[in-house]
Structures are given as C-alpha cells and as structure tokens.
C-alpha cells in the first residue's frame, strides 16, 4: 500500500458557491465523474471527513444504472467497514472533505484518486490527489470533468428525480477539442466495386486479380467470368433486390460469384459453410432466395431447403454462357447482407449499399498502405465482415487477392503466405502470433483486429513487420479506426484514430448525452459507411439511432452521416486516438468472431429448461474460450452464498450432464464457434447489486481455475501413463511446448482438447512438430486427439502423395513423409 507522501496533487480549482449542500453536491458529482471514468456496474467510494485534525472513514456502495436518479445516488448505502470486494477493484476512488488544506493522512493502497473538497476565502475548492506518476493525465481529466459538472449543475438545486444518465457537463474546451478530432469531411463515394474492377480489367487486363490454391485469375479473366455468371443469373430471372446466399469453401470461384452477384444487381449473402443446416435454412427464411451458390458436397445440400435452386457448375457456365446485357449500376442499391449473432436467438443481417462499401474502402486504403502492388491474404470465411477488406478493398486498389487452401492455412500458414507472395494480412492476434516474418519475406503489413491485442503478440512481431491495430463492426462494414505502426511502447488497447468516420463517446445509457473529452463512454460511429439497418427492419436492440440533439446544437457546421452505437466502451486519448475499455452488454468475440451471449443462453433455456446456465468468454491460463457456467444451487435466496467453482465429483458430474443434454441441441442450431468448449460448475451465479448477472465476477472465477482443476472439470484421468516409444515421446514434448506445461503432466491417453488444446493450438502443434521432423496436420489431431492414438495412426500410415492445383495453374506434387 502507498502512503500519502507518494501522492501528487493536481492544480487547485476555485469553485462557484453552490446553492446546495457543498459536501452532498461534491459527493454526487464526484460519483458521476468516477462512473464516467470506468462505468462499472457497482463500485466502492471511500469517503473521508476531517474533524479536529482527525479523519473519519466510511464507504458507499455506488451502483449507477440507466434509471438511477440523483436521489438514489445520494442515498447510496453507507458502510462503516470496507466491503470484502473493495480490494479487488482496479483503482481506489475516494472523496475527502476538510475545512482547510489539511492533507489526507490515510493509506488507500494501489492506484488511487482522491477528490479533496476544501475551502478558501469562503469559497469551495477542489483538487485531485493521485498515486503513481503515470496517472497525472487521468487525474486532470477527472478534475476537469468534475469542474464541468459543478459549473453546469452547482448553481441550481439538485433535482433528486433526475436520472443520472441525463446529467451533462461539457465545457467549451471539450466542445472545441471534440470538434477538432472530428473535423474531417465525411466523404461519400457514388460508385460500385464491380465497376472499379471493370476499369482495372480494361486498363491492366493481364495483372493478377486472384492467386489461389486452385488457380489464378487476371483482372480480365475475373471480370469475364463474373459477366458470364451474372448473365446466367439475369436470364434465370434474378434481378435487383434479390438475395443470393453463397455457401462456399474458399476458392477463386468465391471471388467470381461475389462479383457476378453484384453485376446482376443482386445482394450477396455469404454464409459460413460450417454452419449447421438449420441455421442456414433459418437465414433462407429471412432472405427468401431463388438460388444459392455452393461448392459443397451433396450431403449438405440435401439438408437445405429444396425449393431454392442450387448453382454449383461454375466452370460449365463460364464455358457455355456468353456475356449479355446486365442491369445498370446503382450505388444506392443494396450490395451485401452479413448475418451476425442476434441476442434473441435469431441471426440478424446487416445490409450495406454499394456507396457505403466504396466509401469505407477509400477511407482505409491510405492507413492500410494498399495499392496495385498489394497482395492481400483472404484468410477468414467470406461470411465474416473482415472479408470485405480482404476482397473488396484489394480489388478496389487494383491488387491481388491471395486465397490459401483451408488445410494449407491450418497446417502451414507461413508456407502458404510465402508461396502466395502475401504482402498484407488481416488477422486476429491469436492467429498472428503464429506468423514468422522471417519465413514470409514478402510480408509487409499485418492488420490486427477482431479480438483484444495482447502484449505477447505485439512484442513478437512489431520489430519485424508493420503492425496496425484496427477496430470496426459488422454494421460499419469495414474498419472505423486504425493505429499508427505499433511499437514496443504501444498500448494494446489503443485502437488508433478514425479512418474516416466521426467517433463520438456518449453515455452508455443515453446517447443524447455527449461525454467530456477523455472520459469513458459508449463509442458511437457517425458515417456514410454504416449499414442501412437490419434485414426486415428488426427493431429489437438495434444500435442504429437518429441524430442526437447535441449533434446539431454543438456542431452545426458539420455535414451529417448515419449513427450507430457500437456497444463498446472507449475513451479519447489526448492525441485523438481511442482506448477501448470492454463492452457494455452481453456481446463478445471469440477468435475474431462476434457472438451474442444472449443467443447462446436462449438455446440453453430451450435445451435445459430447469437449469440456470450462463455463457461467457473466459481466459484460463493463456487460453481464451467460450465457457458455460452451470449453477448448482436451487435455493431461492442465494445472497449468503459466496460464488465459487466446484470441483467435487458430484458437481463435475452435474456439469457434464448439462453438457451432454445441451450440446446436441446447440450444435444443431449454432455455428461451432458458439458452442461452449467447457462447462464450469459453480455453486451460485454471482449477481450485481442491481440483480444482473455479474459477468466480471464469472470471468474472475474462471481465471482462478488451475491446470489440475481444469482437467478434473473436463474429466481427464488422474493417471498419466507415460510414452512407450520415441514417437509418443516426440508428440508429448510437442504438446507440452505448445500448451506450456511439463511433459510428465500429459499422459498418452489424455484428450488434446480436454487438457487446454483448441484449433489454434493444434495449428501451433503442427508447426512445432515440423521442427522436430514430425509431419502431421490439424486433421490428424482432430481425428486422433490422444498421444497414443495419434502415434498409432502415424505408424500405420504410409507415405502419401497427392496432386493439387498450384499457384500458377499447374499440378504440384505434395508428399507427406511419416517418420
């Protein structure tokens, strides 16, 4: 704990005399200030009052929700003793009152901020005391916000019925700075991506547009193939406004059908081919397609709606159909519909017009250093919005899209990137940490997004390749912000400055309340790049909002775009970049893929109607995963139960029974990345003071799970049979290196995915095994997830040779040698 003499003070501000009780007003406004600094569901305010040279210390439990009033805030429960969870908070916030400049002689511990309210010449004064040299900027922001609130509300009586979320306090300086950081013009491109591709085909017909595992296409070939398939669509009665789903594994044909759909005037609807058939059919019911594209086998097709025609004979169409008249381009027409997880249990489709996509692309070409020399890797499924950047932005720039095979990117990511000549890659930090720039000499830029950036990834790559931290949402279509080149001194949560949109920070419960510069609030995007909304105008929980009143009143000279509330909490840094602080709702991301935890819990209620199960993304050790917390207690009143993870045999059996009961139903309704990997038994689901699920506490509980407890929960055998031969010892050593544990703690019958492994760590195993002259692939691990079974499989396998279509339209022999 830090004694007071390590504290530093901000300047002292002289406040106007208030018509309210000074101490009561100060505590209320300081509580609001702190809430806008971190936006926790509940926290502890340490209150210090001086009398006769001595200090009295009490505590207030503060919980500010959307409906919380000033009166409720002032009546916050007072405690004489510190709550048991007070020491768990990231920062200590205190409010001190004294009749003089008497210093606060107390120990508050850790990083602390104390608002000291004093008096000078009959007028109140305020200063913020803070510990830690790095907290000066935050302390000044806190003092400025408090001062703005005092100036706005101190001269009139406090309205006890007024909701806290309506309490504003912008200073003239805040307005000036916000206008400065958002002063750029909102551009709007009136063009279509397929028209830009046509221009490239005319001006540079022989330049590579696609370099894929199954073949290459020049811009002339790409445009010609797309024209022929679009002509077929038009002749089949497909026209403007028709939705065409595409359920395809990555291939150069994937790029062709995207352009063909747009040229026909239709709407491209990408669907992940790994989705269960029930989810695909559910999307069909929302878009009512006449046809869909696929390159999947007949087994999947038989499960889909038979009334929708299937188009899969792309090569035959290109050979037999001559290009014909196509509908005129309309930049205001809908171009794409990306489906994402919905909180009501039903996926929702965000629709973008051509102009929005083109506008977003033009905004980011400069920050991402993309031009005709760009070779961008198409890594993600086309169903994810990142693919717009990978595909559309690359084509707009006149560059080349590099398409690795699915198995190739899993088993030899660096080799695939090297063979394709990749210069740009858009990756999640989890995947990026597997990239070795020394093995990919062409690689220049990696854009990191989709999940929080960790310092390990930053340190591993920033000196060898140009790293850019990026941020955006499905509703934005592309990226909203991008950082400068990351260095070892960069903060991973800094997402950089706007690439074009205006970025506003508003109150999480009231977008009509623009927050002071530097405080934490919900990130709101204003742009012409935004989606028009969701298909079917789904009104529930939409983030699309009309222009707030402050937008016209404070910034009347700025042209206006559309507005979207992201649900992300952020704050402005002094240089105009933005720092992220988590989410305000139940939306989460796992390995770059957006999920609504509410949609998963909706399925749990149907599958396990008598159980309470909460889904949450947690981190255990170095691994982030989607977990299901299974509540064991059936008591009505659980207030006296201290939530904890239960690892006794009965609790574990109960959680495993929940897994067995729910997994089939979840797997049939949700994509595989939305099915929990782990079921954690807890005696009680923790709640906040307001009665909501305390997700922060759940994440903390999960973080305390040890390796031994993890294996107990996953049903891993205590007995660890050790390797019997050299091959098993090699595999054990490889697993141990990747999972960061002692080799002796892994038995030959332990299941890889129950001892901390996942698909990403399986990719790492493949790479690590290669350095040990052991050649395996991810499919081998999936099919043989124990050391014993994998070693036996490798022993029984012979040398396999197969042909695949190479990077230059020639057959390449690939040999897998089994040691």
UniProtKB/Swiss-Prot annotation:
According to the record, the residues making up region (Adenylation (A) domain) are 202-591
Q: Which residues carry this modification: O-(pantetheine 4'-phosphoryl)serine?
A: 759
Similarity section: Belongs to the NRP synthetase family.
> What domain of life is recorded for the organism?
Eukaryota
Keyword annotations for this protein, in alphabetical order, are: Ligase, Phosphopantetheine, Phosphoprotein, Repeat, Virulence
Extract the GO molecular function terms from the UniProt entry. ligase activity; phosphopantetheine binding
Name under which the protein is recorded? Nonribosomal peptide synthetase 9
Q: What does this protein do?
A: Nonribosomal peptide synthetase; part of the Fg3_54/C64 gene cluster that mediates the biosynthesis of the octapeptide fusaoctaxin A, a virulence factor that is required for cell-to-cell invasiveness of plant host. The 2 nonribosomal peptide synthetases NRPS9 and NRPS5 form an assembly line which likely utilizes GABA as a starter unit (loaded on the unique module M1 of NRPS9) and sequentially incorporates seven extender units composed of the residues L-Ala, L-allo-Ile, L-Ser, L-Val, L-Ser, L-Leu and L-Leu, respectively.
User: What SMART domains does this protein's entry cite?
Assistant: PKS_PP (SM00823)
Tell what the record comments on domains. Answer: NRP synthetases are composed of discrete domains (adenylation (A), thiolation (T) or peptidyl carrier protein (PCP) and condensation (C) domains) which when grouped together are referred to as a single module. Each module is responsible for the recognition (via the A domain) and incorporation of a single amino acid into the growing peptide product. Thus, an NRP synthetase is generally composed of one or more modules and can terminate in a thioesterase domain (TE) that releases the newly synthesized peptide from the enzyme.
GO CC annotation terms, alphabetical: cytoplasm
User: Which major enzyme category is it?
Assistant: ligase
The organism of origin for this protein: Gibberella zeae (strain ATCC MYA-4620 / CBS 123657 / FGSC 9075 / NRRL 31084 / PH-1)
**Entry's EC annotation:** 6.3.2.-
Q: Which GO terms describe its biological process?
A: amino acid activation for nonribosomal peptide biosynthetic process; secondary metabolite biosynthetic process
For this protein, the record's InterPro entries field holds:
ACP-like_sf, AMP-bd_C_sf, AMP-dep_synth/lig_dom, ANL_N_sf, PKS_PP-bd, PP-bd_ACP, Ppantetheine_attach_site
């Amino acid at each position: 704990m830090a004694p007071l003499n390590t504290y530093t003070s901000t300047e002292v501000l002289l406040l106007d005399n208030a018509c309210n009780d000074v101490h009561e007003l100060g505590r209320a406004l300081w509580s609001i200030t702190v809430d806008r600094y971190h936006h926790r569901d509940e926290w502890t305010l340490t209150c210090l009052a001086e009398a006769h040279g001595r200090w009295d210390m009490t505590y207030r439990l503060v919980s500010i929700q959307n409906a919380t009033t000033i009166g409720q805030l002032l009546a916050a429960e007072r405690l004489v003793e510190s709550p048991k969870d007070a020491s768990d908070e990231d920062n200590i916030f205190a409010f001190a009152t004294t009749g003089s400049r008497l210093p606060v002689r107390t120990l508050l511990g850790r990083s602390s901020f104390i608002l000291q309210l004093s008096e000078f010449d009959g007028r109140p004064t305020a200063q913020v005391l803070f510990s830690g040299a790095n907290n000066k900027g935050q302390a000044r922001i806190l003092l400025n916000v408090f001062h703005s609130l005092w100036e706005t509300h101190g001269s009139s009586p406090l309205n006890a019925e007024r909701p806290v979320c309506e309490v504003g306090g912008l200073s003239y300086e805040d307005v000036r700075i916000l206008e400065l950081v958002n002063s750029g013009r909102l551009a709007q491109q009136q063009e279509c991506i397929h028209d830009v591709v046509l221009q490239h085909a005319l001006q540079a017909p022989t330049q590579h547009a696609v370099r894929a595992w199954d073949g290459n296409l020049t811009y002339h070939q790409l445009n010609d193939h797309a024209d022929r398939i679009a002509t077929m669509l038009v002749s089949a009665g497909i026209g403007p406004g028709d939705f065409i789903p595409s359920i395809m594994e990555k291939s150069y044909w994937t790029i062709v059908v995207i352009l063909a759909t747009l040229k026909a005037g239709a709407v491209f609807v990408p669907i992940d081919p790994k989705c269960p058939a029930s989810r695909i059919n559910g999307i069909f019911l929302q878009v009512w397609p006449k046809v869909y594209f696929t390159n999947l086998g007949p087994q999947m097709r038989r499960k889909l709606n038979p009334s929708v025609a299937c188009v899969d004979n792309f090569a035959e169409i290109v050979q037999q159909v001559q290009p014909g008249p196509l509908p005129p381009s309309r930049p205001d027409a809908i171009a794409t519909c990306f489906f994402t997880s919905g909180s009501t249990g039903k996926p929702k489709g965000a629709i973008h017009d051509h102009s929005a996509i083109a506008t977003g692309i033009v905004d980011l070409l400069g920050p991402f250093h993309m031009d005709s020399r760009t070779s961008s890797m198409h890594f993600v499924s086309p169903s994810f919005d990142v693919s717009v950047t990978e595909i559309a932005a690359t084509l707009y720039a006149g560059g080349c899209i590099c398409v690795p095979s699915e198995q190739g990117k899993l088993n030899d990511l660096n080799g695939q990137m090297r063979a394709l000549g990749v210069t740009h890659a858009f990756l999640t930090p989890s995947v990026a940490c597997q990239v070795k720039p020394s093995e990919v000499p062409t690689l220049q830029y990696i854009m990191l997004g989709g999940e929080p950036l960790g310092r390990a990834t930053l340190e591993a790559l920033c000196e060898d390749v140009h790293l850019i931290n990026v941020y955006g949402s499905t509703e934005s279509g592309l990226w909203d912000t991008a950082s400068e080149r990351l260095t070892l001194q960069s903060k991973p949560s800094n997402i950089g400055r706007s690439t074009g949109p205006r970025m506003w920070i508003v109150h999480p419960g009231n977008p009509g309340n623009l927050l002071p510069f530097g405080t934490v609030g919900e990130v709101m995007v204003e742009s012409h790049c935004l989606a028009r909304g969701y298909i079917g105008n789904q009104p529930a929980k939409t983030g699309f909002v009309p222009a707030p009143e402050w937008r016209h009143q404070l910034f009347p000279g700025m042209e206006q775009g559309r507005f979207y509330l992201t649900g992300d909490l952020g704050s402005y840094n002094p240089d105009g970049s933005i720092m992220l602080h988590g989410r305000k709702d139940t939306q989460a991301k796992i390995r770059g893929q957006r999920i609504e935890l509410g949609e998963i819990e909706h399925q749990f209620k149907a599958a396990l109607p008598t159980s309470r199960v909460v889904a949450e993304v947690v981190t255990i050790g170095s691994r982030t995963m989607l977990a299901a917390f299974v509540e064991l207690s059936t008591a009505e009143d659980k207030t006296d139960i201290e939530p904890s993870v239960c690892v006794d045999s009965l609790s574990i059996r109960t959680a495993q029974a929940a897994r067995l009961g729910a997994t089939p139903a979840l797997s049939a309704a949700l994509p595989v990345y939305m099915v929990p990997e782990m079921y954690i038994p807890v005696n009680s689901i923790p709640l906040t003071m307001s009665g909501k699920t305390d997700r922060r506490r759940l994440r903390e509980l999960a973080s305390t799970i040890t390796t031994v407890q993890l294996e107990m929960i996953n049903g891993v055998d205590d007995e660890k049979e050790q390797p019997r031969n050299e091959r098993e010892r090699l595999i054990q050593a490889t697993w141990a290196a990747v999972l960061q544990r002692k080799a002796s703690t892994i038995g030959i019958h332990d299941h890889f995915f129950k001892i901390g492994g996942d698909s990403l760590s399986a990719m790492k195993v493949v790479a690590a095994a290669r350095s040990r002259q052991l050649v395996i692939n991810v499919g081998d691990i999936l099919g043989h997830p124990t050391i014993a079974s994998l070693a036996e499989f490798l022993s029984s396998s012979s040398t396999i040779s197969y042909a695949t279509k190479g990077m230059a339209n020639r057959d390449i022999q690939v040999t897998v040698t089994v040691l």
